[in-house]
Amino acid sequence: MLTGTLQMMGYEFFFTFNEERLSLIPKEEEKDEIRYAWFHTKIGTAIFAWPGNPKFVEEDFLYGRANETNRVITFLTNKHTQLQENNGIITVPILAYFFSYSDRPRISRISFSGLELNYIYPINRTFEISYKPEEHDGKINISTYDFDSTTTEEQKFNVFGKEVQVYFGVTRTTSLSIEKPPLTLSSSMIFHFEETQDYSFVRELYRIAKEFIQFLCNRRNVSFTDIRLSNNQGKVGEFNVIEESIEIEMKPLKDGRYIQQKYIAGYEGKILDDIAEKNLYLRHLGKSFRDSRIIDAASFVLRTAAFEWEFSRLFSEDEWKSEQRKILEEEASKELERLIKNSTGKLKKIYKDLKKSVVSYFSLSQKISQTFEEYGVTILDKFGSYLYKLNNISYNHSEIAERIGKQRNNFAHGNLDKEFINESLLDVVFLEQIVLAMQLQYFGIDEVETKKIINKVFCYNLIV
């Protein structure tokens, strides 16, 4: 528990903070003034009604000084969740916080470390061990490689119009303490940018970094054990985000179910750009690896939604329409536009509805078939034929596409009377792999590397 003082919305408060909840205690002489002004509605002279209108914090950031450490603590507030008051104590919703030695420090660098990163950028490739077993003297030499050879080339992406550089490296920590190992290595992902005091920008970088690791691990329950802020003068402090605790899973990491940095080298910036713009579909990812093995109506529909989104980014449906079809659609649209102008009331509405249906769109089944045509031979068939053979189901592109389309429609339209298509369960498992392949192709990763990634993430253990 930390205590201290801070100012908010024109008043000075004593605060308590337990790393999750920020509670503010006003001065005794201002307690009633704040309570009635913020949490009651005035309906007459000296007459107030409770509750009043919702009250929200106005500042993006609050700056306090902790009594226990004499350091400045900066809180990033949640301006969309209302303040709560109980017996004069005000609870302020916060998103994140960090400590620093100075007020309003500038930030130009954020470093992320964590369990998943140690696998994505393997730490076991950053050192060598040498010893002479024949001498039996117990001497073992551990030598780390230099910084240049353990740091990747910088890539660039943009956030809110600002350029950010990203690279991977390895942090070395030595200790003479009994409680700690003499040498600790940990992989880090570093974002470097122009100095800023906009800590909302820093939090946005956190979102982007986390979603990037979620994409690489193909699941949502990833975490960072250490997030360090620094600037041109040196270290600033550790960045802490307030969020629900997650289940830590070792099995998918031990099984190799993640994308190593070496497979996407040179493309990190493009992937991060997509995440920054919120264009990379990740809603279909399971909350955990265990959760992703459970297929229900919701996860089925989300995977098909992911497919359709990625399909729209890779392909234009006009490419596969004949010129004659395009001409006829244009003529029909013009004729219906003439009828709309010359009609009124319900008839006009009918013509408008008809115009919307003139332009034909590919069905989900057609899109899946087209994707097989594009990537079947070069990428997908190697894994699909193995997977379906393993489950004693015929591997047929058109049948897979038709089953997924029908079952998705049954779920989406609430057709409870329709019998579940059993084979579609395997189809949607394979569809998850198709989606990842499409995403990798969109980023420009070549077919060989894409197959290596699919082979690793989904544990096929095939020769590719």
Model-derived segments and their meaning:
Residues 199-269:
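Internal, Lys/Arg-enriched amphipathic helical interaction segments that engage polyanionic partners
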Residues 4, 10, 44, 52, ...:
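Residue-identity detector for glycine
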Residues 18, 53, 67-70, 78, ...:
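Detector for Asparagine
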Residues 34, 47, 57, 72-73, ...:
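Extended aliphatic helical segments
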Residues 1-216:
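Long, contiguous, compositionally biased segments that the model treats as domain-scale units
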Residues 247-464:
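Amphipathic, oligomerization/interface secondary-structure segments
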Residues 21, 35, 65, 71, ...:
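Arginine residue identity/basic-tract feature
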